[in-house]
Amino acid sequence: MKIAVKKSCRNLSELPQELLYKILGLLPTRNVVSTSLISHQRRSQFHWMERLKFRYPRLLLDNRVPDAENEAENLVPGPSRCYHEDPKSCIIQEQIFLPYTSGSFHVQTRISSQRLIHNQHRKCQLRCVVQLSSFCLLSLQQIRLQRC
């Protein structure tokens, strides 16, 4: 694809949009945001860039993420972001290590809640349905454990 560029262009923001999308599509999102190219006039520009979807079978409640170098194969191109995507559901299954020796706990989210009873090894299986949209994923920090 050939794109004509004016010789007077001194800033990235003066480049044609097609070329700018190509350049920004090669950068990580954090770097794109730090360039401040996404100004008020280009606020929705990142919705047209390809995004990476992180596939990892276990989501950890303490927000630890796997080492990026070892988990690079779990990053796969996902669908492009747009406002008309339908919300999707996914099931998150996680082990919670509880500091108590007996009793039951109630796991509550904004969407669904389920009663958990831990076993001899003091761990529970958390299985909840979380509604996903193209913009937000319910944070695991929002899951509250309450002792019954």
From Swiss-Prot:
Pfam families: F-box. PROSITE patterns: FBOX. Coiled coil: none annotated. Residues 9-59 form the F-box domain. InterPro entries: F-box-like_dom_sf (IPR036047), F-box_dom (IPR001810). It comes from the Eukaryota. This is F-box protein At3g55900. It comes from Arabidopsis thaliana. The lineage of its organism: Eukaryota, Viridiplantae, Streptophyta, Embryophyta, Tracheophyta.
